[in-house]
Structures are given as C-alpha cells and as structure tokens.
C-alpha cells in the first residue's frame, strides 16, 4: 500500500506542475498576437480610395515621413486626382523634391480633427507654405482649404494623426 500511495503523490505533483506551467505559458502575449496601430502611411497604403496618393508616396520614398507624430494629412482621394486631371505619373515625372513638396503641402504638423480646425493659416511641412482655411459663406460649418477643396470625409483616425479626405488637391499641377 505504501508504494501505491508514494506513486500517487508523484503523479499528483506532476499533474499540478504541468497544469500551472500550462497556465503560465498560455497567458504570455506573443508579438504576432498584438494588433499594431495603423499610422497615416498604413491607412494610405491599405485603402483603395488612395491608390494615386499611394503611388506618389511609394515612388518618392515618403512612407517614413508620414510615420512621424502629430500630423494632419489633407488627402485627396482618387476621384479628386481624376477630377483635377492629375495622375501619379505626372507627379512622379517631377523632380523628387517637387514631388515631395506636392505631398508635404497637404500636411500640417499638428493633429487636428475637423472640429478643432479653425479659420486661419496653418503652416505645412514645406517651409514658408501654408494652408488657409475659411468657411463657406453659404454654409459656415463647411471648411474650404486654400479656396479650392472641401473636406468630404472627416477624421480618419490613425495612430500618429488624422486624415481629412478632400475633394481636390491643394496644389495646382500644370
């Protein structure tokens, strides 16, 4: 009888240790299980509405520039580019500095929601350039950017800022 009792204690101890080690190892988070936040770059690269802007960003090595903190991107969607007769090929045929300036003229270095934007000048990422925001005279709740564009989709949130989708590019391209 003593031999069976001795084996039973070891078996019970083994089961308890196995049970607790199973609990401990199953509760650890793996990096692959964690949902990573999307930056402005990630949103642009994954959203089919921004295929023209995506091509411009990728061709001009701007992915990292849009991963910095506290940005507001006024992003023209594909329809905005099409209605303005601007293609990614036209932008990418510019010098690299001009193409980068085209994108940077759509970005302010502050995270602004639509509700916090005021009628004023906001400096863009291009030194000496700004976006002028005014109200539409017929509808004071509608904001006009540089006298050209309206925000058509408000407050697309990203981990490092906000995207305001606009109906026209803020830069005239010839």
Model-derived regions, located:
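Mature, structured domains of secreted/extracytosolic soluble proteins
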Residues: 2-13, 21-174
């Amino acid at each position: 009888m003593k031999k069976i009792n001795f084996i039973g204690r070891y078996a019970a101890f083994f089961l308890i240790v196995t049970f607790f080690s199973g609990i401990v190892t199953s509760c650890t988070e793996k990096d692959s299980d964690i949902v990573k936040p999307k930056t402005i770059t990630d949103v642009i690269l994954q959203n089919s509405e921004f295929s023209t802007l995506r091509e411009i960003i990728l061709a001009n090595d701007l992915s990292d520039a849009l991963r910095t903190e506290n940005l507001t991107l006024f992003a023209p969607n594909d329809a905005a580019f099409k209605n303005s007769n601007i293609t990614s090929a036209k932008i990418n045929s510019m010098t690299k500095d001009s193409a980068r300036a085209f994108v940077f003229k759509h970005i302010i270095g502050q995270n602004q929601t639509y509700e916090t934007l005021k009628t004023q000048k906001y400096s863009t990422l291009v030194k000496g350039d700004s976006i002028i925001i005014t109200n539409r005279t017929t509808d004071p709740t509608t904001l006009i950017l540089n006298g050209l564009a309206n925000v058509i989709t408000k407050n697309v949130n990203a981990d490092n800022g906000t995207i305001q989708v606009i109906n026209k590019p803020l830069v005239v391209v010839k």
